[in-house]
Amino acid sequence: MNDPQLNNLLKWGIQNSDASRNDPSTAPQPLSEVDKEALQQLIAGVRGPSDADLMQDSFQVIENNEATAEAKHQAFENFEQLIQGIDNANNMEALGLWTKLIKQLESEDPVIRKWAAWCCSTAVQNNVRSQERLLVLKNAIPTLVRLATSDPDKTARKKATSALSSAVRNFQPGLDAVLEHMPAEHKPKEALDANDMASVDILINKLRESI
């Protein structure tokens, strides 16, 4: 072992082992700040990257112009699986990933647009905190409405419709924003109640039937 910090950790571990603690002549030795840092790094290495690290890694691939389309699609699939956990979905804001995600809705690649809409849907489903975040993001709702009503790729339209469905249920401000940007031919004539699933379905089913 050539790393001095790891050598110090090993020495500290031996000194503070059960055998040493049972020896009256051996007093426990505290870790120095440098050794504490080394211990944290060692533990992190054993545990592997955190979900936050993996989420950021996914977007490094997605935003890499040199990455293949296949690699980007796989990165998006990995990201979508991660944000199925509500804590990870809520952590998107702190990691600065919401703005990056919305930007991908404008991708020239229809598969990327599909995945971006899919991830929006996953993040906001039954999650009022993420619903609120999507609402205030510039162009997020208008872009999803445009994709749901006019994207040339049917799969992207379906996922955008799913994202709108998740964004408005039990969240009246989101429903009001979607209706505000909805083209007239897709907008129901009656008033809609976000807390009434049958009411919301009037809008969502109308969108799905148009695909």
Swiss-Prot record:
Residues 12-31 are annotated as: Disordered. This is Hsp70 nucleotide exchange factor FES1. It comes from the Eukaryota. Functions as a nucleotide exchange factor (NEF) for Hsp70 chaperones which accelerates the release of ADP. Required for fully efficient Hsp70-mediated folding of proteins. GO terms for biological process: regulation of translation. GO terms for molecular function: adenyl-nucleotide exchange factor activity. The lineage of its organism: Eukaryota, Fungi, Dikarya, Ascomycota, Pezizomycotina. Residues 12-29 have a biased composition (Polar residues). Its main location: cytoplasm. GO terms for cellular component: endoplasmic reticulum. InterPro entries: ARM-like, ARM-type_fold, Hsp70_NEF-Inhibitors, Nucleotide_exch_fac_Fes1. It comes from Phaeosphaeria nodorum (strain SN15 / ATCC MYA-4574 / FGSC 10173). It is found in: Cytoplasm. Keywords: Cytoplasm, Repeat, Translation regulation. Belongs to the FES1 family. ARM repeats lie at residues 27-67, 86-125, 129-169.
